C-alpha cells in the first residue's frame, strides 16, 4: 500500500484526514506525513495496518503493485 493509495482511498470514501484519524486512532499529523510521502510510506507497521484495515472495512480494495501503477477500488453494495 503506497502513500498515494492511502490518499486516493480516503478521498474515495469521502473522509477528511481528521475523520480517518478518528477512525484509526492514528494521529492526523501522522496521516498527513504518510500522505505527503511518495511510494511506500515510512511509518510503523501498526499504523499502516490500522489505516489499511479501516479503509478496507469501508469498502476499499487496494489493487496493483507499488511499481506498476497501484490504485484503489471502492466496493459498494451495488458491486
Task: Give names to the regions the model predicted.
Residues 60-79:
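Helix-turn-helix/homeodomain-like alpha-helical modules used for DNA recognition
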Residues 1-2:
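Absolute protein N-terminus
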